[in-house]
Amino acid sequence: MYNGPMLEALPLEVFFGVGGVFSVLVVYFALFRGGKAPPSKASQELEQLQKTVAEKQSPRKNYKTLQEAMSQTQKSFWGRMSSSLVGGGAVDRAQLEAIEEVLYTSDLGPKTVQRLFASLESKLSQSLGSDALKQALKQEMISIFSSVGDINNTAFQVLPQGLTVWMVVGVNGAGKTTTIGKLASQLQQSGKKVMIAAGDTFRAAADAQLKVWSERAQVEIYSPENVKDPSAVAFEAVNKAQARGFDVLIVDTAGRLHTQVNLMEELKKMKRVIQKVNVTAPHEVILVLDANSGQNALIQAEQFHQALGVTGVILTKMDGSAKGGVAIGVAGDVGLPVKMIGVGEAVEDLRTFSPTDFVDSIL
């Protein structure tokens, strides 16, 4: 009987050499793992992406109310403001100045704060209590939203006939690609024939994400191989979408900082190229902003609007953010309508923006 050391107590290199160990592992996976080699990092990332998109498209079991989604902003905004109104009775000058400080630190933007404060200050002589002051603040906020669009109709434009083109822009990390996927899914569910143009030719992951979203949403994607010019992608996409009778074309663009002048010029070029194919397009230039960016989101909005003539804003990641007041600043400081907000991961969590409901949820 062999009384030496057990084989498993010795490293494999003793028997097979370093190179041989790799061969043994390959044979092991081939024989005992169904003939499949270990999944590559790329395949694992794609699998995770597909899983994530599937989860976002699945029906929500617990639908979040807007009040629940905006709870952090409500605590940060009215929660801090109401602490300045302790004691009851009419609001005095000192309390009003404390409210002004809360407004300035709530990501509303300086112009918006000045307008709100002036409105409240003009009512100081009326000896308003805290409830009356809250109502006055609500009315002025809704007035700000009304000044940039119809507060009862904030939907993006879809033409009754012919092709509608939406151009979607924003910085990296704002949730632009995911938002495009959700928009496409919602349009498809409403009966529209939708195409997505993969105009972000700089980030490989963007193309992969859009392809997964297009498959899940059952919409077509135009993503030509070996084409690195985003304007060329946009040009051909508009031509193809028009020729084949699509209702809506959503053009993705490369995410870039609003301070990158050359890249912003490229976006201008894309818009001009789209107009060469369809003189009325793009019918919407949609800016996606991360609500957590706060004051920086207002700077982004100003720069993108100056360069491209933004027609509407989508604010993402509003749920769990204490900076939701930026929606008021987008309207008051930049003069742009907020059209939709993202309050969760699911497709239906990208919602049409109601200024009245929004104001009620934070005050």
Task: Annotate each language-model stretch with its function.
Residues M1-A155, L159-G162, M167, Q189:
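Non-catalytic terminal/linker segments enriched in charged/polar, low-complexity residues
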Residues K111, Q135-L363:
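P-loop/Walker A NTP-binding module and the surrounding RecA-like catalytic core of P-loop NTPases
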